Amino acid sequence: MEIFHISAECYPMAKVGGLADVVGALPKYQKNAGNDVRVVVPAYDTKFKKENNFECVHWGTVKLGNFNFPFSVLKESSDKLGYELYLIEIKELFNRPNVYGYEDDIERFLSFQIAVLDWIIARNKVPDIINCHDHHTGLIPFLLQFAYKYENLKDVKTVITIHNGLYQGWFGFDKLYYLPEFDLKHIGFLEWNNCINSLAVGVKCANAVTTVSPSYLNEINYSANGLESLFNSVRNKSKGILNGIDIEIWNPLKDQMIAANYSIENFEIGKQKNKEKLCEQFELDPSKPLFSFIGRLFEEKGGDLLPQASALALSEHFEEINILILGSGNAEIESQLTQLRNDYKGNYNVFIGYNEELAHLIYAGSDYILMPSRVEPCGLNQMYAMRYGTIPIVRRTGGLRDTVIDFGDDGNGICHDQASVGDICYSINRAVKLYDDKISFNTVLRRGMAADHSWERVCQEYIEIYNLIIQQK
């Protein structure tokens, strides 16, 4: 079947979070399974775009109300990604370094969605499936069904995959005229709390709804930033599918970004070499257990808990542990974490920002990864960590609940229930004791490394959903 994935992010073209990793991996495995797969994202001004070759396969003009924006469809020439990657180039709106955070984001992603559909209908070939990802593409199922200009695409089956339901793409009805013409009797599909809610539109109109873990599907039925009743009403067309990870990229045996390669058979030597390299870089002691955090420094990820939790844990275990933070986000949290460097030099360090190569080294060189998330629809970091023999310390929520079992229950990690400084510190205390028991520590570590988080299983679950909705009239 022919499958289109439409997304705001796709690794390695543009990455802000886990959305990019999923959209960069799932299509590759779907193509390996014999499908014709295309990924479409905006043409941001990124390093990948500058360093790779593209050919223009279509051009046109997006009409956004009274505004007209020329656009081009650029195809990545090498096909080295394992699927066909297309960029929608609207220079006035997307020739910028960042993915999000602009005042005209509504206009940017509306124009992107319209340009995608304008191109698809111009191909004179109707795809079997369009899989939309998050609110940035949530209007596509509505436009396919009801916009006059896309009449010939109305039978295309659509799936919307929710990677994070907190972000919903709200905008007012004063911008309704941006949309291609449709019969106003269908306007109710757009409305949610007297506004247009892009995510809600997608959930209402798509043939199927998926979330990125089974537990997250359950959680959004009682906590979804105002959409709880909607998610309850569409349970019959919804499924939670736990994400996989790209085990070709995330492979400690072949990873070129780490100091020494290793496998489950010889992890002790390999991890120690990576730990020494990492600790040398950040002036830490490689003989102590290393607790690391990789992620965005926001409340959603528990980032606001890290300064106090780090300070308390270091005060209690100053001679026993190291803590390393890699992340960016809230300026106040960044400042607090940076200030700790002076108080706990030699046991603590922080890198404000994000660096992919450094992230790989941290997964390889750390003993524990901290994930105190308040919300974690799936979470990929815990899977990356386990793949590299680093034990996750997590709060039980979303995909963390589905992937990490406490070592007290013969599991692969350390779990707590509350998003609190106290629970984080208690888990660190347990981790220190576990680290001192090398036999038990290595047993937990091996369980994580042995887990199967590959995309083959995930790919098949998506294909089953596609086949099911294609059969529906």
From Swiss-Prot:
Gene3D superfamilies, A to Z: Glycogen Phosphorylase B
This protein's record includes keyword Transmembrane: no
Reaction(s) catalysed (UniProt annotation): [(1->4)-alpha-D-glucosyl](n) + ADP-alpha-D-glucose = [(1->4)-alpha-D-glucosyl](n+1) + ADP + H(+)
Entries under SUPFAM superfamilies matching the protein: UDP-Glycosyltransferase/glycogen phosphorylase (SSF53756)
Key words of the record: Glycogen biosynthesis, Glycosyltransferase, Transferase
Enzyme class: transferase
Binding locations of ADP-alpha-D-glucose: K15
InterPro entries assigned: Glyco_trans_1 (IPR001296), GS/SS (IPR011835), Starch_synth_cat_dom (IPR013534)
One BP term from GO: glycogen biosynthetic process
Pathway: Glycan biosynthesis; glycogen biosynthesis
The enzyme's E.C. designation: 2.4.1.21
MF GO annotations: alpha-1,4-glucan glucosyltransferase (ADP-glucose donor) activity; alpha-1,4-glucan glucosyltransferase (UDP-glucose donor) activity
Database matches in CDD domains: GT5_Glycogen_synthase_DULL1-like
Family note: Belongs to the glycosyltransferase 1 family. Bacterial/plant glycogen synthase subfamily.
UniProt-recorded name of the protein: Glycogen synthase
Species this protein is from: Flavobacterium johnsoniae (strain ATCC 17061 / DSM 2064 / JCM 8514 / BCRC 14874 / CCUG 350202 / NBRC 14942 / NCIMB 11054 / UW101) (Cytophaga johnsonae)
Gene name of the record: glgA
